[in-house]
């Protein structure tokens, strides 16, 4: 935190201050196709080098670490990080697969489809997404979810901050499933956060579905 205190704030992902970015005159801008608006990216591309990431799988996330490391002249550090992450990927516990739903929002209830990074993480840790046939972040109902009878329902800490009280709310309708609060960072943050996230997932997965 101390290292980034002096880094200027240039707005939000949907509301960047383009003039402030121009004043900083960055060597490289890293954008995300889902988080940033197309018109902002195109405007910045007129004056700066912009890497536009679109990450839907663990493999794509590792590739972007490689690419950004190369662009920033820190390939050795990037490759070391990739190696360490791959070590964790190779340490998935030998546990039985479970069917699972991962909820990200309430009112309306929303889950994740097969073309998301979250889905990729779930699959790697043997949590078979019951919304595998859906795209992106589908709106669902708890009544329909209960008919799918997932072994496990995961309530993420973000973007909706699910709490203990929501377990009771979901269990009233999905009484046949185990319901668990999870740290959203484990499933949805990529880049350098993958390493601590995957360590936690390996530890937690050993305790689920025993």
Residue ranges and their predicted role:
Residues 1-210:
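N-terminal ligand-binding lobe of clamshell/alpha-beta domains
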């Amino acid at each position: 935190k101390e290292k980034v205190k002096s880094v200027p704030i240039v707005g939000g992902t949907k509301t960047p201050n383009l003039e402030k970015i121009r004043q900083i005159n960055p060597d490289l801008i890293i954008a995300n196709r889902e988080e940033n608006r197309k018109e902002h990216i195109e405007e910045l591309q007129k004056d700066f080098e912009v890497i536009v990431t679109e990450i839907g799988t663990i493999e794509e996330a590792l590739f972007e670490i490689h690419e950004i490391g190369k662009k920033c002249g820190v390939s050795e550090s990037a490759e070391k990080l990739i190696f360490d992450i791959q070590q964790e990927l190779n340490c998935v516990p030998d546990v039985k697969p479970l069917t699972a739903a991962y909820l990200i929002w309430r009112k309306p209830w929303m889950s994740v489809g097969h073309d998301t990074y979250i889905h990729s993480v779930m699959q790697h840790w043997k949590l078979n997404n019951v919304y595998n046939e859906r795209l992106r972040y589908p709106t669902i109902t708890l009544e329909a979810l209960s008919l799918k009878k997932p072994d496990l329902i995961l309530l993420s800490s973000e973007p909706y901050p699910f709490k203990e009280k929501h377990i009771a709310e979901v269990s009233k309708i999905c009484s046949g499933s185990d319901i668990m609060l999870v740290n959203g960072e484990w499933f949805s943050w990529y880049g350098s956060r993958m390493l601590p996230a995957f360590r936690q997932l390996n530890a937690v997965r050993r305790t689920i579905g025993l």
